[in-house]
C-alpha cells in the first residue's frame, strides 16, 4: 500500500518522519539467477541442520520455554574461536539489530557520527531513527577511505570493511589510526564480508579482522554476521566484539527492548556453524576462487572491476550503461544490483554465485556485447 493511502493519524511524529530501509529485492520466480543480495551460493554447514533437527527431535518440548537470554553457548564458541573472553562477545537477531543497538548505545545527539558517503544504506536510517546527526565523508576518487578525512569532532565512526558496495578494504593500520586518534569516540567496524578477505592472504596485515585490535583499543567495536560467510541469512544471527564495557552497554540496551533476541533454533544452528571450522574455511575459499574467475571474465568483456574483498564484485561496463545492462539481464531472469546514485550509477554490484550462475551471466553479457557490436558496425 502506498503511503498516500495509509491513515497515519494515530502515528507518532517519529513514525511519520522515518525513512525506512528498503531491503534488496527478493523475487521468488522459478529459474531465477539471483545475484543481487550477496547471499552465499553454498549451503550452510551440514552440522547446522543436524543441530536444529536435534533440538526439534529431542528437545521439542523445551520450545515452550524461553531460550537462554544471554546465548552463553554461542557466545562461548565465538569467544573460543577468536581467543576472547565471553564478556567481549555480544549476539543479536542479525547484525542489523546489533547495529541498531550500536547507534542507540554509543552515538550522541549533540555530536555527529561519521560514515563514508558510499556505504551500507542502513546507516542513515539508524541515524534518522535515533535522532543522530550523520556526517557522510566522501570516498576518494578511487573509492578508497582516507582516515585523514575523519579528523573532526564526533561521537563515533562507523565503517563497513570491506566496504559495500565497492568491496574495497581498509587496512588494519588505518583502523588502528582511527581508533587511536578518536580515543573518546566509539569506532565501529562493520565486518559483514571480512571472511572473504581474511582467508585470501592470511599473512597480510591488511587482510586481518579488526577483532585482533579490540584488546588494544577500548573504544573499538567490531560487528559481524552469520548471513554471508556462514550461509545463514535465513537464521538471522549477528554479533559484536569489543571491550567488556562496550558489550555491557549493548546488553543493557538489548534488554531494554527484547531480553530474548535469539531463539533456541538459531542458537543451536549458529553454534554448530562456529564449531565446523573446516567447512567454513572451505566454502569461503570457494567463494574467493569464484570471485577471481568472475573478475577475470568480466575484465575480458571490457568491464572495469574494483578489487573486491567481499562475496560480490563492483563492475562498470565499458560504456557506463549499467542501468541498461541490469534491465536487459532482468529480462532474461538474471538479477543484479544497480544503484541509481551519483558516482556509482555506472556500476553493477554482482553477487558471487555458483559456477552455473556465472556461466549464465557471462553468456548473457557476451550476447549483449555482440548485439552492441553489430549495431555499432
From Swiss-Prot:
Entry keyword annotation includes Isomerase: no
Residues bearing the modification N6-(pyridoxal phosphate)lysine: 228
EC numbers for this chain: 2.6.1.9
Record flagged with keyword rRNA-binding: no
Keywords: Amino-acid biosynthesis, Aminotransferase, Histidine biosynthesis, Pyridoxal phosphate, Transferase
Cofactor(s), names only, from the UniProt record: pyridoxal 5'-phosphate
Regions crossing the membrane: none
Name of protein: Histidinol-phosphate aminotransferase 2
Source organism of the structure: Psychrobacter arcticus (strain DSM 17307 / VKM B-2377 / 273-4)
Amino acid at each position: 500500500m502506498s503511503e498516500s493511502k495509509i491513515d497515519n493519524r494515530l502515528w507518532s511524529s517519529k513514525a511519520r518522519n522515518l525513512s525506512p530501509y528498503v531491503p534488496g529485492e527478493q523475487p521468488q520466480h522459478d529459474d531465477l539467477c539471483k545475484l543481487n543480495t550477496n547471499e552465499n551460493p553454498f549451503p550452510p554447514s551440514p552440522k547446522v541442520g543436524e543441530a536444529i533437527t536435534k533440538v526439534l527431535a529431542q528437545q521439542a518440548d523445551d520450545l515452550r520455554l524461553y531460550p537462554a537470554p544471554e546465548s552463553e553457548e554461542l557466545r562461548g564458541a565465538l569467544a573460543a574461536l577468536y581467543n576472547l573472553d565471553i564478556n567481549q562477545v555480544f549476539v543479536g537477531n542479525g547484525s542489523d539489530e546489533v547495529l541498531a543497538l550500536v547507534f542507540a548505545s554509543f552515538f550522541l545527539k549533540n555530536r555527529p557520527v561519521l560514515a563514508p558517503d558510499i556505504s551500507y544504506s542502513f546507516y542513515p536510517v539508524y541515524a534518522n531513527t535515533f535522532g543522530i546527526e550523520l556526517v557522510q565523508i566522501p570516498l576518494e576518487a578511487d573509492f578508497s577511505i582516507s582516515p585523514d578525512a575523519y579528523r573532526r569532532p564526533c561521537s563515533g565512526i562507523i565503517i563497513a570493511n570491506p566496504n559495500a558496495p565497492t568491496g574495497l578494504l581498509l587496512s588494519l593500520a588505518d583502523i588502528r589510526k582511527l581508533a587511536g586518534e578518536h580515543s573518546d569516540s566509539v569506532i565501529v567496524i562493520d565486518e559483514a564480508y571480512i571472511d572473504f578477505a581474511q582467508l585470501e592472504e592470511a599473512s597480510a596485515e591488511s587482510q586481518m579482522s579488526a577483532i585482533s585490535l579490540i584488546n588494544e583499543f577500548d573504544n573499538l567495536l567490531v560487528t559481524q554476521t552469520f548471513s554471508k560467510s556462514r550461509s545463514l541469512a535465513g537464521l538471522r544471527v549477528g554479533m559484536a566484539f569489543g571491550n567488556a564495557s562496550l558489550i555491557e552497554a549493548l546488553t543493557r540496551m538489548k534488554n531494554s527492548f527484547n531480553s530474548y533476541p535469539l531463539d533456541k533454533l538459531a542458537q543451536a544452528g549458529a553454534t554448530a556453524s562456529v564449531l565446523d571450522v573446516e567447512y567454513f574455511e572451505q566454502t569461503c575459499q570457494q567463494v574467493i576462487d569464484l570471485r577471481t574467475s568472475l573478475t577475470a571474465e568480466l575484465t575480458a568483456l571490457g568491464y572495469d572491476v574494483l578489487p573486491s574483498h567481499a562475496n560480490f564484485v563492483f563492475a562498470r561496463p565499458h560504456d557506463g550503461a549499467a542501468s541498461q545492462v541490469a534491465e536487459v539481464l532482468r529480462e532474461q531472469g538474471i538479477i543484479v544490483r544497480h544503484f541509481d546514485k551519483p558516482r556509482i550509477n555506472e556500476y553493477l554490484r554482482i553477487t558471487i554465485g555458483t559456477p552455473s550462475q556465472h556461466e549464465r551471466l557471462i553468456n548473457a553479457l557476451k550476447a549483449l556485447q555482440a548485439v552492441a557490436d553489430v549495431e555499432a558496425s
